[in-house]
Amino acid sequence: MKHLTKLLAAVLLALGLNQAVWADDVSDFRETLQLAEQGDAKAQNNLGAMYATGRGVRQNYAEAVKWYRQAAEQGLAAAQYNLGARYFTGRGVHQDFHLSKEWFGKACDGGVQEGCILYRYLNQKDY
């Protein structure tokens, strides 16, 4: 079980990183931040990814979660998946498989196939 969990965590991270468009440098970070602060869900998701990886800004998992959550609450399926991945791995939040399943379910409803797969996996594990 531990091996499977580690494997799924690695897959989640790899897949989650593909859910956002990367900024090239600090100026792109600033532009993305400005859009995110104005409520642009895609920019919020991208900003979360930038914080998660340290691209254009110092890596900060808690900030990544903050921005993923804002985009996810607006209904952006990619952000819902990314937030589910954070709860699955416990990076930036306390690990919570129930919340992970909830966000993966929303991502699945929004058309993110990886969210469907992980929702079913967590459902089979009775979360």
Predicted regions: what is each one?
Residues 9-18:
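Bacterial N-terminal signal peptides
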Residues 46-53, 82-89, 118-125:
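Hydrophobic face of amphipathic alpha-helices that form TPR/SEL1-like repeat modules
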